[in-house]
Amino acid sequence: MTSNQLAQYIDHTALTAEKNEQDISTLCNEAIEHGFYSVCINSGYIPLAKEKLAGSNVKICTVVGFPLGANLTSVKAFETQEAIKAGANEIDMVINVGWIKSQKWDAVKQDIQAVFNACNGTPLKVILETCLLTKDEIVKACEICKEIGVAFVKTSTGFNKGGATVEDVALMKQTVGNIGVKASGGVRDTETALAMIKAGATRIGASAGIAIISGTQDTQSTY
């Protein structure tokens, strides 16, 4: 796989609280320069990213219910609508992990369905936070996502105790079939990214995108 091909797997990510306008501007410039698929940013920076990415092919991805997923469903749906109105091209929502742990599967499904409906055709990725789930819970969550028809299931926020693993990516891909799988959290070098893709990942979320495509190791990135 060439570096240009690998770049098209990457959502170039900056989600930590301290990121300032210059950081986001740099992120956008890097995404254009290296041909990344998208930038993944908090929704408050969508207008800035829209301005910086004008005329390019780079998409704007934003997060909803991030990073805990425990918001009211109505708030997630509203957040989604506002983000799309501002210019988001893709939505990454966090599943309600607490409801999964409470076995409230109907509520989990309704939560995702509400955001899916609010997307109104905008691609939706559902973050499972796999490090907190059992294998059975991962499968069940993936089955719900597949039934609803979301665009992707995603491993992690990158803000919890663990990120993507090859094992979890393979399990997710096996469960969802043709739906996309996004590996995120801890993917910081070419070898790891390629292992995730081999396991079934069709998108990589990373703040170390430049290191991934250049074959270097990034020890500074947090996502």
Swiss-Prot record:
GO annotation, biological process: 2-deoxyribose 1-phosphate catabolic process; carbohydrate catabolic process; deoxyribonucleotide catabolic process
One GO term describing the cellular component: cytoplasm
Active-site residues per Swiss-Prot or TrEMBL entry: D92 (proton donor/acceptor), K154 (schiff-base intermediate with acetaldehyde), K182 (proton donor/acceptor)
EC numbers: 4.1.2.4
Subcellular location: Cytoplasm
Principal place of residence: cytoplasm
SMART domains attached to this UniProt entry: DeoC (SM01133)
Enzyme class name: lyase
Keywords, ordered alphabetically: Cytoplasm, Lyase, Schiff base
Entries under Pfam families matching the protein: DeoC (PF01791)
Catalytic activities: 2-deoxy-D-ribose 5-phosphate = D-glyceraldehyde 3-phosphate + acetaldehyde
GO molecular function: deoxyribose-phosphate aldolase activity
Pathway linked to the protein: Carbohydrate degradation; 2-deoxy-D-ribose 1-phosphate degradation; D-glyceraldehyde 3-phosphate and acetaldehyde from 2-deoxy-alpha-D-ribose 1-phosphate: step 2/2
This protein's record includes keyword Hydrolase: no
Keyword Nucleotide-binding annotated: no
NCBIfam families membership: deoC
Job of this protein: Catalyzes a reversible aldol reaction between acetaldehyde and D-glyceraldehyde 3-phosphate to generate 2-deoxy-D-ribose 5-phosphate.
Family as reported in the entry's similarity comment: Belongs to the DeoC/FbaB aldolase family. DeoC type 1 subfamily.
Protein name (Swiss-Prot/TrEMBL): Deoxyribose-phosphate aldolase
